[in-house]
Amino acid sequence: LLSTENIGLNGPFQTVIMQGASFEPLTSQDRATFQATVVHYADKVRAHGAEPMLYMTHAYVPPHPRTDANMIDTIAQTYQAAAKAAQAAVAPVGLAFARSYQQRPDYSLHMTFDGTHPNLQGTYLGACVVYLSLYGGNLDGLNYDYFGRLPKGEARYLQKIAEETIADFQAATQ
């Protein structure tokens, strides 16, 4: 799993990004298992010379049957506790989704058929958050629009959400 030659790389990984299943924060037993698993794999990542990072998942939205307005709070607490126990960084993707839905409730980031998987906009937002979590800075000059499928105004909105989320998350966790 952590052998770079398996994917054609000649050097070690610098960062390994890990994500749990979306249901793991939903019960205390699953949260405990998640945290123990994160600690275990973070140790393996470090043993291979890399740093661990967690990709914080986003909350379910309708039509998912387990939609809960407070789900993102549970997710954030779960990921932050696991990151602290594992001494890992967090890419707060779930918080970026929540911020976007607060600012523009009708702007969808999820596939409409299940309310759990991200659509193009959600995937773009997640990528922006991960980029900023890894490299810092800002997204000025990022012109990628998925071959014209993401209008420039939408791309800039999602970049702004990512930048604001990272700034607030870093201020709250440092």
What are the functions of these language-model segments?
Residues 110, 117, 127-174:
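Conserved catalytic region of serine esterases and O-acyltransferases that act on ester linkages
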Residues 122-125:
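Mature-region segments of soluble proteins
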Residues 5-120, 132:
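Alpha-helical cap/lid subdomain in secreted, periplasmic
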